Amino acid sequence: QVNSGGRNIYYYTHVLMADGLHTDAYIDYVLGFYDKCVNKTDLSAVSAAVEPDETTDAEQTLAYMDIHDSVDQLTWGNLNPQIYYKPTPRIREINENTATLTMDYRIASLTDSGETELYNVHESYRVRYTDSRIYLLNLERTTDQIFNPENSVLQDNGINLGITDKDVEFVTDEENRVTAFVQENELWTYRRLDGTLTKVFGFPQKENMDYRDFYDAHSIHILRVGREGDVWFAVAGYMNRGLHEGENGVAVYYYEAASSTVNEEIFLSSMESAEFLKRDVDSLAYISQDGSRFCVLLEGNVYQIDLNSRTYEVLVSDVAEDCHAASQSGRYFAWLPQGDAGDSTALNVLDLETGATQEITCGADERIRPVAYMKEDLVYGVARAEDIDVSHGGNGIFPMYRLTIRDGEGNTVKEYEPAGAYVTEVEQSDNMLTLTRVVKNGDVFAEGTEDHI
Protein backbone atom coordinates (compact mmCIF):
# COMPACT_ATOMS: atom_id res chain seq x y z
CA GLN A 1 0.00 0.00 0.00
CA VAL A 2 1.30 3.45 -0.98
CA ASN A 3 -0.23 6.81 -0.08
CA SER A 4 -0.03 9.32 -2.93
CA GLY A 5 -1.86 12.61 -3.26
CA GLY A 6 -3.99 11.87 -0.22
CA ARG A 7 -5.25 8.51 -1.44
CA ASN A 8 -4.19 4.93 -0.88
CA ILE A 9 -2.89 2.95 -3.86
CA TYR A 10 -2.84 -0.82 -3.50
CA TYR A 11 -0.53 -3.19 -5.32
CA TYR A 12 -0.76 -6.94 -5.29
CA THR A 13 1.02 -9.91 -6.76
CA HIS A 14 0.48 -13.64 -6.82
CA VAL A 15 3.43 -15.70 -5.65
CA LEU A 16 3.35 -19.41 -6.40
CA MET A 17 5.72 -21.58 -4.37
CA ALA A 18 5.97 -25.05 -5.85
CA ASP A 19 8.58 -27.56 -6.95
CA GLY A 20 8.90 -29.11 -10.37
CA LEU A 21 7.16 -26.42 -12.41
CA HIS A 22 9.88 -26.41 -15.11
CA THR A 23 9.51 -22.66 -15.54
CA ASP A 24 12.93 -22.16 -17.13
CA ALA A 25 12.30 -24.94 -19.62
CA TYR A 26 8.97 -23.47 -20.69
CA ILE A 27 10.41 -19.98 -21.13
CA ASP A 28 13.41 -21.28 -23.06
CA TYR A 29 11.11 -23.25 -25.34
CA VAL A 30 8.79 -20.39 -26.32
CA LEU A 31 11.68 -17.97 -26.79
CA GLY A 32 13.46 -20.57 -28.90
CA PHE A 33 10.38 -21.19 -31.04
CA TYR A 34 9.86 -17.46 -31.57
CA ASP A 35 13.53 -17.03 -32.52
CA LYS A 36 13.40 -19.88 -35.06
CA CYS A 37 10.33 -18.36 -36.71
CA VAL A 38 11.67 -14.82 -36.90
CA ASN A 39 15.13 -15.82 -38.11
CA LYS A 40 13.89 -18.74 -40.26
CA THR A 41 16.34 -21.20 -38.67
CA ASP A 42 16.05 -24.86 -37.61
CA LEU A 43 12.89 -25.26 -39.66
CA SER A 44 12.85 -28.99 -38.94
CA ALA A 45 12.22 -28.22 -35.25
CA VAL A 46 9.35 -25.92 -36.18
CA SER A 47 7.95 -28.60 -38.48
CA ALA A 48 8.11 -31.21 -35.72
CA ALA A 49 6.14 -28.96 -33.36
CA VAL A 50 3.23 -27.86 -35.55
CA GLU A 51 0.16 -29.84 -36.62
CA PRO A 52 -0.89 -29.10 -40.22
CA ASP A 53 -4.42 -30.22 -41.15
CA GLU A 54 -7.17 -29.41 -43.64
CA THR A 55 -7.26 -25.79 -42.41
CA THR A 56 -3.55 -25.22 -43.06
CA ASP A 57 -2.95 -21.79 -44.64
CA ALA A 58 -6.66 -21.57 -45.43
CA GLU A 59 -6.73 -17.83 -44.80
CA GLN A 60 -3.43 -17.09 -46.53
CA THR A 61 -2.81 -14.20 -44.16
CA LEU A 62 -0.19 -13.31 -41.59
CA ALA A 63 -2.80 -11.47 -39.53
CA TYR A 64 -3.77 -14.71 -37.77
CA MET A 65 -1.77 -17.93 -37.53
CA ASP A 66 -2.03 -21.02 -35.36
CA ILE A 67 -0.49 -24.43 -34.75
CA HIS A 68 -2.22 -25.80 -37.87
CA ASP A 69 -0.48 -23.44 -40.30
CA SER A 70 2.49 -24.43 -42.43
CA VAL A 71 6.11 -23.89 -41.50
CA ASP A 72 6.39 -21.33 -44.30
CA GLN A 73 3.46 -19.36 -42.91
CA LEU A 74 4.68 -19.52 -39.31
CA THR A 75 8.14 -18.36 -40.36
CA TRP A 76 6.56 -15.27 -41.92
CA GLY A 77 6.42 -16.37 -45.57
CA ASN A 78 7.94 -13.72 -47.85
CA LEU A 79 8.24 -11.25 -44.99
CA ASN A 80 11.77 -10.86 -43.64
CA PRO A 81 11.16 -9.52 -40.14
CA GLN A 82 13.71 -7.84 -37.93
CA ILE A 83 13.18 -7.55 -34.19
CA TYR A 84 12.23 -4.00 -33.27
CA TYR A 85 11.24 -4.65 -29.65
CA LYS A 86 12.04 -7.94 -27.95
CA PRO A 87 9.38 -10.04 -26.21
CA THR A 88 9.04 -10.67 -22.50
CA PRO A 89 7.26 -13.98 -21.80
CA ARG A 90 4.32 -13.88 -19.39
CA ILE A 91 3.19 -16.99 -17.57
CA ARG A 92 -0.61 -17.15 -17.55
CA GLU A 93 -1.09 -20.67 -16.17
CA ILE A 94 1.37 -23.24 -14.91
CA ASN A 95 1.47 -26.59 -13.15
CA GLU A 96 3.75 -29.62 -13.04
CA ASN A 97 2.77 -30.77 -16.53
CA THR A 98 1.54 -27.85 -18.62
CA ALA A 99 1.80 -24.08 -18.93
CA THR A 100 0.29 -21.23 -20.92
CA LEU A 101 2.57 -18.34 -21.85
CA THR A 102 2.03 -15.20 -23.93
CA MET A 103 4.47 -12.82 -25.59
CA ASP A 104 4.14 -9.41 -27.22
CA TYR A 105 6.82 -7.97 -29.45
CA ARG A 106 7.33 -5.69 -32.43
CA ILE A 107 8.95 -6.50 -35.75
CA ALA A 108 10.06 -4.36 -38.70
CA SER A 109 10.21 -5.20 -42.37
CA LEU A 110 11.20 -3.40 -45.57
CA THR A 111 8.83 -3.19 -48.51
CA ASP A 112 9.98 -3.58 -52.11
CA SER A 113 10.03 0.22 -52.37
CA GLY A 114 12.27 0.54 -49.31
CA GLU A 115 9.62 1.69 -46.83
CA THR A 116 9.86 0.42 -43.25
CA GLU A 117 6.72 -1.18 -41.87
CA LEU A 118 6.23 -2.01 -38.19
CA TYR A 119 4.02 -4.77 -36.78
CA ASN A 120 2.82 -5.64 -33.29
CA VAL A 121 2.76 -9.38 -32.68
CA HIS A 122 0.92 -11.27 -29.94
CA GLU A 123 1.62 -14.96 -29.37
CA SER A 124 -0.02 -17.47 -27.03
CA TYR A 125 1.58 -20.85 -26.31
CA ARG A 126 0.21 -23.91 -24.57
CA VAL A 127 3.03 -26.37 -23.79
CA ARG A 128 3.49 -29.69 -21.99
CA TYR A 129 6.61 -30.92 -20.21
CA THR A 130 7.96 -34.47 -20.37
CA ASP A 131 11.32 -35.86 -19.35
CA SER A 132 12.33 -36.28 -22.97
CA ARG A 133 11.06 -33.03 -24.51
CA ILE A 134 8.53 -30.20 -24.41
CA TYR A 135 5.46 -30.53 -26.62
CA LEU A 136 3.63 -27.63 -28.23
CA LEU A 137 -0.07 -28.21 -27.54
CA ASN A 138 -1.38 -25.00 -29.07
CA LEU A 139 -0.11 -21.82 -30.66
CA GLU A 140 -1.97 -18.69 -31.75
CA ARG A 141 -0.38 -15.60 -33.27
CA THR A 142 -1.96 -12.31 -34.29
CA THR A 143 -0.14 -9.63 -36.26
CA ASP A 144 -1.25 -6.03 -36.68
CA GLN A 145 0.52 -3.43 -38.74
CA ILE A 146 1.18 -0.06 -37.15
CA PHE A 147 -0.36 2.63 -39.30
CA ASN A 148 2.17 5.02 -40.81
CA PRO A 149 0.80 7.77 -43.09
CA GLU A 150 4.31 8.46 -44.40
CA ASN A 151 4.17 5.15 -46.26
CA SER A 152 2.11 4.49 -49.38
CA VAL A 153 -1.21 3.95 -47.60
CA LEU A 154 -3.61 5.98 -49.77
CA GLN A 155 -5.02 4.05 -52.70
CA ASP A 156 -7.73 4.66 -55.29
CA ASN A 157 -10.19 2.45 -53.42
CA GLY A 158 -9.38 3.59 -49.88
CA ILE A 159 -6.72 3.35 -47.18
CA ASN A 160 -4.39 0.36 -47.05
CA LEU A 161 -4.06 -0.70 -43.41
CA GLY A 162 -1.78 -3.62 -44.28
CA ILE A 163 -1.68 -6.81 -42.24
CA THR A 164 -4.36 -6.51 -39.58
CA ASP A 165 -7.68 -7.81 -38.33
CA LYS A 166 -10.50 -7.36 -40.83
CA ASP A 167 -12.76 -5.91 -38.13
CA VAL A 168 -11.66 -2.25 -38.05
CA GLU A 169 -13.62 0.31 -36.04
CA PHE A 170 -14.46 3.39 -38.10
CA VAL A 171 -17.10 6.12 -38.09
CA THR A 172 -17.82 8.77 -40.73
CA ASP A 173 -19.64 12.07 -40.45
CA GLU A 174 -23.14 12.34 -41.93
CA GLU A 175 -21.83 13.72 -45.24
CA ASN A 176 -18.98 11.20 -45.56
CA ARG A 177 -16.42 14.00 -45.60
CA VAL A 178 -14.32 12.74 -42.68
CA THR A 179 -13.65 9.21 -41.47
CA ALA A 180 -12.25 8.38 -38.04
CA PHE A 181 -10.71 4.94 -37.57
CA VAL A 182 -8.77 2.99 -34.97
CA GLN A 183 -5.67 1.01 -35.87
CA GLU A 184 -3.54 -0.64 -33.19
CA ASN A 185 -5.07 1.50 -30.44
CA GLU A 186 -4.34 4.73 -32.26
CA LEU A 187 -7.12 7.03 -33.44
CA TRP A 188 -6.79 8.65 -36.87
CA THR A 189 -8.92 10.84 -39.10
CA TYR A 190 -8.98 10.93 -42.89
CA ARG A 191 -10.32 13.96 -44.73
CA ARG A 192 -11.54 12.90 -48.16
CA LEU A 193 -11.44 16.32 -49.84
CA ASP A 194 -7.69 16.81 -49.50
CA GLY A 195 -6.51 13.32 -48.46
CA THR A 196 -5.23 14.55 -45.08
CA LEU A 197 -4.46 11.93 -42.43
CA THR A 198 -4.20 13.10 -38.82
CA LYS A 199 -3.27 11.19 -35.69
CA VAL A 200 -5.73 12.18 -32.98
CA PHE A 201 -4.82 9.98 -30.02
CA GLY A 202 -2.62 7.12 -28.90
CA PHE A 203 -0.49 6.19 -25.90
CA PRO A 204 2.53 4.84 -27.88
CA GLN A 205 5.41 7.22 -28.56
CA LYS A 206 7.79 7.27 -31.51
CA GLU A 207 10.81 7.96 -29.34
CA ASN A 208 11.89 6.85 -25.86
CA MET A 209 9.76 3.74 -26.12
CA ASP A 210 9.17 1.59 -23.07
CA TYR A 211 6.74 -1.10 -21.93
CA ARG A 212 3.91 1.42 -21.68
CA ASP A 213 3.87 1.55 -25.47
CA PHE A 214 2.99 -2.14 -25.65
CA TYR A 215 0.69 -2.66 -22.68
CA ASP A 216 -2.58 -3.33 -24.46
CA ALA A 217 -5.22 -3.15 -21.72
CA HIS A 218 -7.38 -0.37 -23.12
CA SER A 219 -9.58 0.31 -26.12
CA ILE A 220 -10.63 3.38 -28.09
CA HIS A 221 -14.30 3.89 -28.91
CA ILE A 222 -15.36 6.46 -31.52
CA LEU A 223 -18.56 8.16 -30.36
CA ARG A 224 -19.25 10.73 -33.07
CA VAL A 225 -17.56 12.49 -36.00
CA GLY A 226 -18.50 16.03 -37.04
CA ARG A 227 -18.51 17.35 -40.61
CA GLU A 228 -15.41 19.49 -39.94
CA GLY A 229 -13.49 16.54 -38.54
CA ASP A 230 -14.19 17.05 -34.84
CA VAL A 231 -14.32 13.72 -32.98
CA TRP A 232 -15.85 12.60 -29.71
CA PHE A 233 -14.24 9.43 -28.40
CA ALA A 234 -13.77 7.38 -25.23
CA VAL A 235 -10.82 5.39 -23.93
CA ALA A 236 -11.72 2.49 -21.64
CA GLY A 237 -9.42 0.38 -19.50
CA TYR A 238 -5.93 0.98 -18.15
CA MET A 239 -4.41 4.40 -18.79
CA ASN A 240 -0.81 3.96 -19.98
CA ARG A 241 0.19 7.62 -19.84
CA GLY A 242 -1.06 11.09 -18.99
CA LEU A 243 -2.83 12.53 -15.97
CA HIS A 244 -4.44 9.19 -15.08
CA GLU A 245 -1.46 6.94 -15.73
CA GLY A 246 -1.84 3.68 -13.82
CA GLU A 247 -5.59 4.06 -13.26
CA ASN A 248 -8.48 2.03 -14.63
CA GLY A 249 -11.47 3.94 -15.91
CA VAL A 250 -13.23 5.57 -18.83
CA ALA A 251 -11.98 8.86 -20.28
CA VAL A 252 -14.09 10.93 -22.67
CA TYR A 253 -12.24 13.23 -25.08
CA TYR A 254 -13.15 15.86 -27.64
CA TYR A 255 -10.86 16.49 -30.61
CA GLU A 256 -11.26 19.88 -32.27
CA ALA A 257 -9.94 19.64 -35.81
CA ALA A 258 -9.58 23.40 -36.35
CA SER A 259 -7.07 23.76 -33.51
CA SER A 260 -5.75 20.16 -33.58
CA THR A 261 -6.33 19.90 -29.83
CA VAL A 262 -7.62 17.03 -27.70
CA ASN A 263 -9.46 17.95 -24.50
CA GLU A 264 -10.43 15.56 -21.74
CA GLU A 265 -14.08 16.12 -20.92
CA ILE A 266 -14.34 13.72 -17.99
CA PHE A 267 -12.59 10.74 -16.42
CA LEU A 268 -14.60 8.06 -14.65
CA SER A 269 -12.37 6.09 -12.31
CA SER A 270 -13.41 2.49 -11.73
CA MET A 271 -12.42 -0.50 -9.64
CA GLU A 272 -13.43 -2.79 -12.50
CA SER A 273 -10.68 -4.62 -14.34
CA ALA A 274 -9.58 -3.25 -17.69
CA GLU A 275 -11.15 -6.24 -19.44
CA PHE A 276 -14.57 -5.61 -17.87
CA LEU A 277 -14.38 -1.88 -18.58
CA LYS A 278 -13.70 -2.52 -22.25
CA ARG A 279 -16.61 -4.96 -22.34
CA ASP A 280 -18.98 -2.47 -20.71
CA VAL A 281 -18.10 0.40 -23.02
CA ASP A 282 -18.32 -1.94 -26.01
CA SER A 283 -21.87 -2.66 -24.85
CA LEU A 284 -22.96 0.97 -24.52
CA ALA A 285 -21.32 4.37 -24.94
CA TYR A 286 -23.17 7.38 -26.34
CA ILE A 287 -22.61 11.11 -26.61
CA SER A 288 -25.65 13.36 -27.08
CA GLN A 289 -26.07 15.37 -30.28
CA ASP A 290 -25.12 18.62 -28.54
CA GLY A 291 -22.14 17.01 -26.81
CA SER A 292 -23.40 17.85 -23.33
CA ARG A 293 -24.25 14.34 -22.06
CA PHE A 294 -22.33 11.07 -22.04
CA CYS A 295 -24.12 7.79 -21.39
CA VAL A 296 -22.32 4.57 -20.56
CA LEU A 297 -22.90 1.11 -19.12
CA LEU A 298 -20.67 0.50 -16.10
CA GLU A 299 -20.84 -2.31 -13.57
CA GLY A 300 -24.44 -3.19 -14.45
CA ASN A 301 -25.83 0.36 -14.43
CA VAL A 302 -26.49 2.84 -17.23
CA TYR A 303 -25.18 6.27 -16.21
CA GLN A 304 -25.84 9.65 -17.78
CA ILE A 305 -23.12 12.21 -17.06
CA ASP A 306 -23.67 15.91 -17.62
CA LEU A 307 -20.31 17.07 -19.00
CA ASN A 308 -20.99 20.69 -18.08
CA SER A 309 -22.04 20.30 -14.45
CA ARG A 310 -20.03 17.08 -13.84
CA THR A 311 -23.12 15.49 -12.28
CA TYR A 312 -24.59 12.12 -13.06
CA GLU A 313 -27.76 10.09 -12.72
CA VAL A 314 -28.51 6.40 -13.02
CA LEU A 315 -30.91 5.82 -15.91
CA VAL A 316 -31.11 2.03 -15.61
CA SER A 317 -29.93 -0.04 -12.66
CA ASP A 318 -29.11 -3.70 -12.18
CA VAL A 319 -28.80 -4.61 -15.86
CA ALA A 320 -28.21 -8.36 -15.97
CA GLU A 321 -25.66 -10.09 -18.18
CA ASP A 322 -27.05 -11.29 -21.54
CA CYS A 323 -30.18 -9.19 -20.97
CA HIS A 324 -29.37 -6.09 -23.02
CA ALA A 325 -28.38 -4.74 -26.43
CA ALA A 326 -27.47 -1.33 -27.85
CA SER A 327 -27.80 0.18 -31.31
CA GLN A 328 -24.80 0.90 -33.50
CA SER A 329 -24.69 4.58 -32.53
CA GLY A 330 -25.48 3.81 -28.88
CA ARG A 331 -28.59 5.98 -28.98
CA TYR A 332 -31.01 3.12 -28.27
CA PHE A 333 -30.56 0.72 -25.36
CA ALA A 334 -32.80 -2.33 -24.90
CA TRP A 335 -32.89 -4.37 -21.70
CA LEU A 336 -34.98 -6.84 -19.75
CA PRO A 337 -36.15 -5.11 -16.54
CA GLN A 338 -36.97 -8.49 -14.99
CA GLY A 339 -33.30 -9.43 -15.41
CA ASP A 340 -33.81 -12.98 -16.64
CA ALA A 341 -32.90 -13.87 -20.23
CA GLY A 342 -35.03 -17.00 -20.06
CA ASP A 343 -38.03 -15.77 -18.10
CA SER A 344 -39.01 -12.20 -19.03
CA THR A 345 -42.32 -10.94 -20.39
CA ALA A 346 -41.30 -7.32 -20.98
CA LEU A 347 -38.53 -5.58 -22.92
CA ASN A 348 -37.76 -1.88 -22.47
CA VAL A 349 -36.11 0.38 -25.05
CA LEU A 350 -34.54 3.68 -23.92
CA ASP A 351 -33.81 6.52 -26.34
CA LEU A 352 -30.74 8.14 -24.79
CA GLU A 353 -31.13 11.26 -26.92
CA THR A 354 -34.69 12.10 -25.85
CA GLY A 355 -34.96 10.11 -22.62
CA ALA A 356 -38.14 8.38 -23.82
CA THR A 357 -38.72 4.72 -22.93
CA GLN A 358 -40.86 2.23 -24.82
CA GLU A 359 -42.10 -1.07 -23.40
CA ILE A 360 -42.54 -4.17 -25.54
CA THR A 361 -44.49 -7.05 -24.02
CA CYS A 362 -45.39 -10.59 -24.99
CA GLY A 363 -48.22 -12.91 -23.98
CA ALA A 364 -48.44 -14.39 -20.50
CA ASP A 365 -47.49 -17.80 -21.88
CA GLU A 366 -44.55 -16.37 -23.86
CA ARG A 367 -41.10 -15.03 -23.07
CA ILE A 368 -39.14 -12.24 -24.77
CA ARG A 369 -35.49 -11.27 -25.13
CA PRO A 370 -33.35 -8.81 -27.16
CA VAL A 371 -31.31 -10.55 -29.84
CA ALA A 372 -29.27 -7.85 -31.59
CA TYR A 373 -29.35 -4.47 -33.26
CA MET A 374 -29.05 -3.99 -37.02
CA LYS A 375 -27.65 -0.47 -37.02
CA GLU A 376 -30.47 1.41 -35.23
CA ASP A 377 -33.15 -1.28 -35.56
CA LEU A 378 -33.83 -3.63 -32.64
CA VAL A 379 -34.14 -7.36 -33.26
CA TYR A 380 -35.98 -9.23 -30.52
CA GLY A 381 -37.36 -12.74 -30.25
CA VAL A 382 -40.37 -14.37 -28.62
CA ALA A 383 -40.54 -18.00 -27.46
CA ARG A 384 -43.36 -20.03 -25.96
CA ALA A 385 -42.76 -20.66 -22.26
CA GLU A 386 -43.53 -24.37 -22.62
CA ASP A 387 -40.70 -24.76 -25.17
CA ILE A 388 -38.01 -23.06 -23.08
CA ASP A 389 -35.48 -25.14 -21.18
CA VAL A 390 -32.77 -23.16 -19.42
CA SER A 391 -32.28 -25.63 -16.59
CA HIS A 392 -28.80 -26.42 -17.87
CA GLY A 393 -27.60 -22.83 -17.88
CA GLY A 394 -25.59 -22.04 -21.00
CA ASN A 395 -26.59 -25.37 -22.54
CA GLY A 396 -30.31 -24.61 -22.32
CA ILE A 397 -32.59 -23.76 -25.22
CA PHE A 398 -34.69 -20.67 -25.93
CA PRO A 399 -36.46 -21.54 -29.22
CA MET A 400 -37.88 -18.34 -30.69
CA TYR A 401 -40.83 -18.91 -32.99
CA ARG A 402 -40.85 -15.26 -34.03
CA LEU A 403 -38.25 -12.54 -34.58
CA THR A 404 -39.28 -8.90 -34.92
CA ILE A 405 -37.21 -6.03 -36.31
CA ARG A 406 -38.35 -2.68 -34.93
CA ASP A 407 -36.99 0.80 -35.63
CA GLY A 408 -36.23 3.51 -33.10
CA GLU A 409 -39.67 5.06 -33.48
CA GLY A 410 -41.33 1.79 -32.50
CA ASN A 411 -42.43 0.81 -36.00
CA THR A 412 -42.23 -2.83 -37.05
CA VAL A 413 -39.82 -3.14 -39.98
CA LYS A 414 -40.02 -6.90 -40.45
CA GLU A 415 -41.38 -10.02 -38.78
CA TYR A 416 -39.80 -13.43 -39.26
CA GLU A 417 -41.98 -16.38 -38.28
CA PRO A 418 -40.95 -19.57 -40.14
CA ALA A 419 -43.43 -22.41 -40.22
CA GLY A 420 -42.25 -25.39 -38.19
CA ALA A 421 -38.84 -23.89 -37.33
CA TYR A 422 -37.47 -22.08 -34.29
CA VAL A 423 -34.46 -19.76 -33.96
CA THR A 424 -32.02 -20.59 -31.15
CA GLU A 425 -29.00 -18.45 -32.03
CA VAL A 426 -28.39 -15.32 -34.07
CA GLU A 427 -25.02 -14.24 -35.43
CA GLN A 428 -24.71 -10.74 -36.82
CA SER A 429 -22.32 -9.81 -39.63
CA ASP A 430 -22.57 -6.36 -41.19
CA ASN A 431 -26.18 -6.06 -42.39
CA MET A 432 -27.01 -9.76 -42.27
CA LEU A 433 -28.29 -12.05 -39.53
CA THR A 434 -27.36 -15.73 -39.66
CA LEU A 435 -29.99 -17.80 -37.87
CA THR A 436 -29.36 -21.16 -36.22
CA ARG A 437 -32.66 -23.04 -36.28
CA VAL A 438 -34.20 -26.17 -34.82
CA VAL A 439 -37.34 -28.16 -35.62
CA LYS A 440 -39.69 -29.77 -33.13
CA ASN A 441 -40.41 -33.50 -33.26
CA GLY A 442 -42.95 -34.19 -30.54
CA ASP A 443 -41.41 -32.79 -27.38
CA VAL A 444 -37.85 -32.91 -28.71
CA PHE A 445 -35.98 -30.28 -30.70
CA ALA A 446 -33.65 -31.41 -33.48
CA GLU A 447 -31.11 -29.53 -35.57
CA GLY A 448 -32.63 -27.63 -38.49
CA THR A 449 -31.38 -25.71 -41.50
CA GLU A 450 -29.64 -22.35 -41.29
CA ASP A 451 -31.37 -19.23 -42.57
CA HIS A 452 -30.53 -15.56 -43.09
CA ILE A 453 -32.20 -12.19 -42.73
Which ranges hold each PLM region?
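Short, surface-exposed coil-to-beta transition loops
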Residues: L118-S124, E299, S344, E366
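Extended, charge-rich low-complexity regions and/or helical-solenoid scaffolds
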Residues: G342-V349, T357-E359, G363-M432, K440, ...
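Surface-exposed, charged secondary-structure patches
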Residues: S70-E115, S219-R227
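Beta-propeller fold detector
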Residues: L139, L197-K206, V262-S270, E313-D318, ...
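Core segments of small alpha/beta cavity-forming domains
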Residues: V2-S4, N8-L79, V153-T196, F203-E207, ...
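Beta-propeller blade signature
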Residues: Y190, G195, G246-S260, L347-T354, ...
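Exposed beta-sheet edge and beta->alpha loop/turn motif
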Residues: T98-L136, E140, Q145-I146
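A short hydrophobic beta-strand element
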Residues: E93-I107, G229-V235, L378-A383, L433-R437
